[in-house]
Amino acid sequence: MNLPSTKVSWAAVTLLLLLLLLPPALLSSGAAAQPLPDCCRQKTCSCRLYELLHGAGNHAAGILTLGKRRSGPPGLQGRLQRLLQASGNHAAGILTMGRRAGAEPAPRPCLGRRCSAPAAASVAPGGQSGI
């Protein structure tokens, strides 16, 4: 009687070993008894990630919803974060973000000797004057 030969991929073996060896390593006394950093204890810095990983509560829910929260930092960073997390055309949103800020583009300086206001308006995109 011949048994069917089964080939086990290296990825499956590696995953199985990680699942068997990783939890005991994480639960060891050295990993579980990490001291709280001074800045977190004194509240002099932001320790949201440290609190999610080591604090009390549902860590999985906190980590899984960390990227979906809308309370981003104000200003340009917050708008960029909202653009990256929103659905739609991200490239178009990022490329037009500066134009939507409400500021008019700065006028280009005139580099020629015979530069006047009407001539500056007739400058071609390549930088050559149309006059």
Curated annotation (Swiss-Prot):
Q: Which Pfam families match?
A: Orexin (PF02072)
Task: Note the effect listed for residue 16 to R.
Answer: In NRCLP1; early-onset; impaired trafficking and processing
Q: Has keyword Signal?
A: yes
- Name the InterPro entries on file: Orexin (IPR001704)
Q: Which parts of the sequence carry Methionine amide?
A: 97
Q: Which UniProt keywords apply?
A: Amidation, Cleavage on pair of basic residues, Cytoplasmic vesicle, Disease variant, Disulfide bond, Endoplasmic reticulum, Neuropeptide, Pyrrolidone carboxylic acid, Signal, Synapse
Cellular component per GO, a single term: extracellular region
Q: Modified residue Pyrrolidone carboxylic acid is at which positions?
A: 34
Which residues belong to the propeptide? 98-131
Broad class of the protein's primary localization: endoplasmic reticulum
Any single GO molecular-function term of the entry would be: type 1 orexin receptor binding
Q: Which cysteines are joined by disulfide bonds?
A: 39-45, 40-47
Compartments annotated for it: namely: Rough endoplasmic reticulum; Cytoplasmic vesicle; Synapse
Entries under PANTHER family matching the protein: HYPOCRETIN NEUROPEPTIDE PRECURSOR (PTHR15173:SF2), OREXIN (PTHR15173)
Q: Which disease is it linked to?
A: Narcolepsy 1: Neurological disabling sleep disorder, characterized by excessive daytime sleepiness, sleep fragmentation, symptoms of abnormal rapid-eye-movement (REM) sleep, cataplexy, hypnagogic hallucinations, and sleep paralysis. Cataplexy is a sudden loss of muscle tone triggered by emotions, which is the most valuable clinical feature used to diagnose narcolepsy. Human narcolepsy is primarily a sporadically occurring disorder but familial clustering has been observed.
Q: What is this protein called?
A: Hypocretin neuropeptide precursor
